[in-house]
Design a protein with these regions (language model features):
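Non-heme Fe(II)/2-oxoglutarate
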Residues: 2-98
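Catalytic core of non-heme Fe(II) oxygenases with the double-stranded beta-helix
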Residues: 77, 81-219
């Protein structure tokens, strides 16, 4: 699903990685250390959010997931950082962009979640609450269901939180995309978005990149 004028917010980047590299990523992920988190949107920088409050929106499934952080807080957090960072070099070539600052790389493995139904999504959030302008790439490691959602609200640093846990009746999806191995969604990271839990597949695995590109850096 898309709406008019969405191109300046988000775009699907199909098959931008060679198949051999796609398979190498899948093989590497099998040997990673994974860490359980009880809600998929949270990470240490989310101290700006009231993460203790229950999610009031009935569309939100507060599912758990497994994560692996490759880069955060200005430095590599994993021995696999350079391997996963190389994914962005293919994106740079495909879209003719230049990444000048890395903000975060996080892998997320989401299994099925009891009670999760069609039309639901995980917590709406932005990944970074301390940077005025940045891009996000959600790379799909495997084919799955559990669409990526982008919503009609942009983060306002004067009015946090980075996670929306209140009932937001005016919050509507302006873009959704179904996970396809080797492809991804590239978008303005200031827009609230949400991952998802699979229903028909055993798992949904993505690599989430947040970064600044040259044009943004020069502003």
């Amino acid at each position: 699903m898309t709406t008019d004028n969405i191109d300046h917010i988000a775009q699907v980047v199909d098959d931008f990685l060679p198949l051999a590299f796609q398979l190498e990523i899948q093989k590497t992920i099998e040997s990673l250390p994974w860490y359980w988190v009880d809600t998929v949107a949270l990470f240490p920088a989310d101290r700006y959010a009231d993460s203790s409050a229950a999610f009031e929106d009935p569309r939100v499934s507060d599912a758990f997931a497994f994560t692996h952080i490759a880069f955060a807080e200005g430095r590599p957090q994993s021995q696999y950082y350079e391997f996963f960072r190389s994914i962005l070099r293919f994106l740079e070539a495909k879209l003719d962009i230049q990444v000048v600052e890395m903000l975060r790389i996080r892998l997320r493995l989401t299994p099925q979640y009891p009670g999760h139904k069609e039309g639901m999504f995980n917590a709406p959030h932005v990944d970074i609450g301390t940077v005025n302008s940045f891009k996000t790439l959600v790379y799909y490691v495997n084919d799955s269901d559990g669409d990526t959602y982008i919503f009609n609200r942009r983060y306002d640093s004067s009015n946090p939180p980075v996670i929306l846990n209140k009932n937001e009746p005016d919050l509507q999806a302006i873009f959704t995309n179904t996970p396809k191995q080797g492809s991804g969604v590239y978008f303005d990271g200031r827009y609230y978005h949400a991952g998802n839990s699979p229903i028909n597949y055993k798992s949904r695995c993505i690599i989430n990149f947040d970064f600044v590109i040259k044009e943004q850096h020069d502003l």
